[in-house]
Design a protein with these regions (language model features):
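Conserved beta-strand hairpin/beta-sheet module of binuclear metal-dependent hydrolase folds
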Residues: 1-44, 153-169
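Solvent-exposed loop/turn segments at secondary-structure junctions
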Residues: 15-17, 65-68, 88-89
Length: 201
């Protein structure tokens, strides 16, 4: 959870309380044998254990809509969920298929969708950006490639520390430093557009 005086939000949700059903309802026997996950504490339970209610979350920004990043959306009904237009168009299309996309996780009628509209304001190496609270502390940028409309988040702390949350653009910080993409096998399985990924990195 990211806490800010103007609102609290999740950047991705991880696995939710209904992950077992989501997997069994939507993946074939073969896919279930390949897709592995380990259930740890859900974000909903983390909130409860820290004395917070689910409505403590003002909105959710998934970096992208793969199953392991949005499973817990169903644990927060009636919450504002942010999405880019390109991601929105893709995840509800016939091209978005399991195991990468599980529509049951994000097609709830109770979800309150909010479209992410980037401004033509450069930030670092990105030509567009969105200052979430208009104070320079939390900046969204487009990082398309892993999915059609993936987003990354810069968090600039008062201490001077900076963090860049990139979703699954890469799985290793060294990939940004080299730069390099994922191994060819997982890249073909999970990345939507390898050319865009290469440009992003």
């Amino acid at each position: 959870m990211i806490e800010h005086p103007k609102g609290n939000f999740f950047f991705d949700t991880g696995l939710g309380t209904n992950i077992d059903l989501q997997i069994s309802n939507n993946l074939s026997f073969f896919a279930r044998s390949v897709v592995k996950y380990k259930k740890l504490t859900t974000v909903k339970r983390e909130l409860s254990e820290n004395g917070l209610l689910s409505n403590s979350i003002d909105f959710i920004i998934p970096s992208h809509y793969h199953w392991d990043h949005v499973s817990a959306l169903s644990d927060f009904p009636n919450t504002n969920v942010w999405i880019t237009p390109s991601e929105d168009n893709y995840i509800f299309s016939s091209e978005a298929k399991a195991p990468n996309f599980i529509k049951e996780q994000y097609n709830s009628k109770t979800t309150k969708w909010k479209t992410i509209k980037f401004n033509p304001i450069p930030y670092e190496v990105f030509t567009e950006s969105l200052d979430i609270f208009n104070d320079g502390s939390l900046i969204l940028v487009p990082v398309s490639g892993h999915t059609e409309g993936s987003v990354g988040l810069f968090a600039n702390l008062k201490s001077g520390k900076r963090y860049f949350f990139t979703g699954d653009v890469t799985w290793d910080v060294k990939a940004f430093q080299r730069p390099s993409e994922k191994h060819i096998i997982p890249r073909k399985q999970v990345d939507h557009n390898t050319e865009l990924i290469e440009n992003t990195i």
